[in-house]
């Protein structure tokens, strides 16, 4: 009888501990969150990541620690994310390279569709043909004519970056030769375009003042229709290169197998960020538009982007390893 009594007491104590631990389980997030940025500090990507991170930190009362891991068009950063726990405490900002890396690299150390959890598309940005102001070309026709006299150099943030893709696609569709000059970041390529070390880029200006101040010359925009931000800048299509359209974008992902509760919470709070005046003003000042969608919609968007560029590459002569 005595043993039965003590066994009963032990059972009740253990049951109480289990119930207490269940009811007092901390709600996500209860510790700092790590936000990986696959590019060097500075530039559009960094500004977007830090704006999102600052808002999430204030909303959740937990630090969001930024960690820049540049290299290999986002592959190095992606490896870090893939090896992290699927608990929502490690997230990553992604750009176009995330979608098209499977087209560039024969073997990746991860599966883009299976090893990540898409959270939401953050923003999309118009791209322009930006040239050094001393380049003797004020429109696409003059640029094409100049390229037939000498090959033009175009810069990018690295092989497979949005600037590389847009530049390679433009030269191929325009039927002219260009020399790709990859940099460790898009902002470095932009500064070298300003200084005249390279001729041009196809990119969104990391600072609109570069164009308004005359440090860069915008001769065409890579959208279907003219942009209200650059009303006097013709599209590349109307300038004589049919069907040319290009843009850059940024999104947020986590490792695979995020729980629905954590995923939905991150998505919901990130959408609050995107609807804030602070974020809208930042994106607008950089020549872009805020986005925001569901995890399922962003997953489809990533696959559609890869399919879009896959078709474009098959129809043009592009070597992305150059």
Where are these regions (language model features)?
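Bacterial N-terminal signal peptides that target proteins for export
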Residues: 1-12
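N-terminal signal peptide c-region/cleavage motif recognized by signal peptidases
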Residues: 21-23
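N-terminal (or domain-start) structured segment
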Residues: 26-114, 151-153, 159, 175-202, ...
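An extracytoplasmic/periplasmic, membrane-proximal ligand-sensing/linker region
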Residues: 30-32, 172, 260-322
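Extracytoplasmic/secreted proteins, especially bacterial periplasmic and envelope-associated proteins
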Residues: 47, 51, 55, 76, ...
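Hinge/capping helix and adjacent helix->loop/strand transition within the periplasmic-binding protein
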Residues: 83-89, 103-188, 236, 249-282
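C-terminal lobe and pocket-closing loops
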Residues: 124, 207-275, 304-307, 321
